[in-house]
């Protein structure tokens, strides 16, 4: 189990906000830049760093709510972790991180990396809640049983999530299915 969570300085974290609180935040941003099973191009390992960097340009005020939501919920960003090259070990690690965060009554917001991390991310939720619904936005269905010999490929990430009987799926915007995945 991950014993202690180490955080970035607030100005270096998600949104670049200056939270003075000790650890009253309800949201913990988890940068997890896994890049293992991509089949076209690369760079997913830089995703969390680039998302956090871009988030510093976001306007914090919400005109519908008439306040800055981060001030009510609080957000803290974990320091990046060393990610194992072995996909099974990487998935176990992100699962343990999320489990630790949930035990502290916080909500993990994971920034990937490739989306093969999704099954590892949801495991603690499948244990904590009777039913969960996964909302999936992607150009592909990611429902293959395996891809290029890898059961935990980015192309089978959502299929692995559906291995848990208490997970249902809403998938939006994919462009095509394969014959074996069309029954899902």
Give the predicted meaning of each segment.
Residues 1-133:
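Metal-dependent C-N hydrolase catalytic cores
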Residues 21-22, 166, 177:
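General structural signal for secondary-structure boundaries
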Residues 79-81, 138, 174:
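Residues at the C-termini of beta-strands that transition into short coil/loop
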Residues 106-172:
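Active-site histidine-anchored catalytic micro-motif
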Residues 175-181:
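Conserved small/polar residues in nucleotide/adenosyl-binding loops
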């Amino acid at each position: 189990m991950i014993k202690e969570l180490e955080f970035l300085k607030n100005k270096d974290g998600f949104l670049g906000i200056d939270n003075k609180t000790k650890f009253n935040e309800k949201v913990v941003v988890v940068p997890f830049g896994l890049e293992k099973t991509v089949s076209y191009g690369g760079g997913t390992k830089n995703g969390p760093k680039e998302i956090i960097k871009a988030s510093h340009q976001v306007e914090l005020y919400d005109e519908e709510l008439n306040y800055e939501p981060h001030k009510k919920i609080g957000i803290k960003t974990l320091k990046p972790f060393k990610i194992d090259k072995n996909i099974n070990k990487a998935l176990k690690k992100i699962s343990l991180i999320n489990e630790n965060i949930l035990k502290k009554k916080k909500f993990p917001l994971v920034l990937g990396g490739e989306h093969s991390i999704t099954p590892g991310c949801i495991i603690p939720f499948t244990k904590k809640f009777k039913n969960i619904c996964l909302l999936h936005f992607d150009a592909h269905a990611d429902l293959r049983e395996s891809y290029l010999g890898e059961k935990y490929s980015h192309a089978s990430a959502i299929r692995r999530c559906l291995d848990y009987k208490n997970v249902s799926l809403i998938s939006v915007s994919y462009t095509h299915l394969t014959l074996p995945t069309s029954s899902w």
